[in-house]
């Protein structure tokens, strides 16, 4: 199976003066991510997937003042404390299908385990480090990768309901994901442990025309991150916990695959890992997805 996602995230942020910079800090951080995925069925119950992240993050500094913390820049460029690249993490996942009722009513349960392999698009030194006079050298806070290998555990539990009524969901359940760093990056950063729980409901629209959406999805994501560390010291604002609502539409045709669009919004100051006073941060995200099952069998694999 081939699938892919495109994510556009716009973070609008501002915070009060910090250090010796006695002016308001205002800007936005725009992220464009493409994540193609290849999934291979090894048996009728086990599949292996490989996902590769590509993207760019761009900071727009919306002030005429000069700052050591912010400027117009993007993640393709190297900086004093950052390696630039368009290549992000690689993710390998192995999933086991515990239950599957096929085209009838019932449960569908996946158990998964995987490995996240970091890219070289990383920060190369602590952006929170201060000089003896409590000033900051020029630095960057963002990159595509955090430089840490991580384990990835996942549980998916969904119920399929073959209803003909539009107001009763045809698919509902949750996904629980846990990522834990296996090491520090070679530059002294240890990433947060991350728990992501996503509950979702899918309603069939019963619309017949090919251009009309076949499904309406509603979801709620819970994200929890533990403290991260730079050189053994807690990274400011790395510990977080917030809820993010989502809404989306699904379009599908039997021979052409399925296409989805989702909208997400969250207002939480922990979205950006910066030690900023009186911050006001909100995020808007659009996600486009495509999925198609290929009628191809690898000769040496007999699922």
Where in this protein do the model-derived segments appear?
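Hydrophobic, lipid-facing positions within transmembrane beta-strands of outer-membrane proteins
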Residues: 2, 32-36, 88-94, 109, ...
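Transmembrane beta-strands of outer-membrane beta-barrel proteins
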Residues: 2-4, 48-50, 107-113, 151, ...
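Surface-exposed strand-loop-strand hairpins of Gram-negative outer-membrane beta-barrel proteins
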Residues: 8-33, 141
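Outer membrane beta-barrel transmembrane domains
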Residues: 14-17, 179, 183-303
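Glycine- and aromatic-enriched membrane insertion/assembly motifs of diderm outer-membrane
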Residues: 26-59, 161-198, 207
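Short loop/turn motifs that connect adjacent beta-strands in outer-membrane beta-barrel proteins
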Residues: 45, 100-109, 123-124, 162-170, ...
